């Protein structure tokens, strides 16, 4: 683990090297704004794993690579503050909500939403997502063309709102909610990081949409209060939630947290789903391999279920490779509240530090031939992502995206259903499809057109691969040890579903290991818990 120290300086205590070429007043903003990724890659190639640049008056320090990422993600909030860095979201989430709330209040708010992302409800989301995809393609016919990104944006609004927000947003407020969400989404752009309240049309529409959504939320709360039965969704969770002092959430707070929920479930997933099909369409050999995996798993009439979605190693590796090359968030930011030390360098309080998944994912020493699309990087034979904090598409540490399991479930379900029915081809040259860096969340440049064709052949005799001969041999020994990284554990309770004899998670998300030295007959269950833990907080050690 990389050593950081928020109190004592290192022996050298020198400032990070600075990027040359800063212009008066605007610093490096012009070059950064043209293409943030190219600029950050240039900084890494020029200065190494840590270096400083300037955006207007803000001094930023970029840290990349596994060691730098670990220092960044494991730093305490008192030293590197996530909330102070994301004031850009205050106009959207609202005053006093999530990033604008004091640390203790923010932690309470985030904990209120955790139950909808736990393992038990997750098992029901698979069928909802499958049904939504099937409904979207019901009238496609044998062939046609679509704007893939726009299709995925519409689809993931439906899947996310249906799974997480409730029926009112999915069915009753469909068109108006989609318009409101679009205006909120457009309000998140790089300019808002520096000047979030400029009197620009895009920001005026953002604020108007936020106010209208709060009106809608207030109305739904009143209607739900008249119903004897309660819904089981994030909305109802927030209506019923209480702070530690017993007070309820206000409609203003509920609105902001619902926006945060849908942003997490939709904002990044649409682009990743589109890129997954684009990358497969670029490479027929990879497309065929994924189709073969799906045919073996489902045959002609097999049902896409929660369990089957967990057993798609090839498709999962394809998605991981897409997220390596096209992470939706190209940089993550923290404000330095106390001097931050990394190796021989000290970043003074008041500056900002950031890390870039996109840059870290292109370090050749970690990922050879980094620009090559190669899903086999993640196979057991290679494990190029084995080094901690090398693959950080979902962040890391205690602030790792709590919805990462939902995101992977949603992505695999969407791609699996689509590819069981259709194949996809590019309508334009391969290099036409590029990332759009004009928004804070990176997606393919629009329009993003593809051609679909109904699959004509599928092996009717394809069956799920036999497990014969693949079962793990029981190791020799007397017991094994379970190690929990408490900083990574977020209380998803997947481990409790897989091995209730070994793990217990309470309503607040606190994990208890029930047996310190379990017998070997529980090893396979423990390994399942380790395998499916969304945050990789569990490690099994044989004695």
Predicted segments, located by residue:
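Cytochrome P450 heme-thiolate monooxygenase catalytic core
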Residues: 5-17, 25, 40, 81-87, ...
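Cytochrome P450 proximal C-terminal region
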Residues: 3-4, 44-45, 133, 156, ...
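Cytochrome P450 heme-thiolate "Cys pocket" and heme-binding signature region
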Residues: 259, 264, 306-307, 343-345, ...
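Conserved cytochrome P450 K-helix E-x-x-R motif and the immediately C-terminal K′/meander segment
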Residues: 26-48, 215, 219, 301-343
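Conserved cytochrome P450 K-helix/beta-meander segment immediately N-terminal to the heme-binding cysteine loop
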Residues: 355-383
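Iron-sulfur cluster-binding cysteine motifs and their immediate structural context
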Residues: 494-507, 530-543
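Cytochrome P450 catalytic-core helices
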Residues: 268-287, 291-293, 405-420
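N-terminal membrane-proximal hinge/A-helix region immediately C-terminal to the signal-anchor transmembrane segment
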Residues: 2-95, 99-108, 123, 127-135, ...
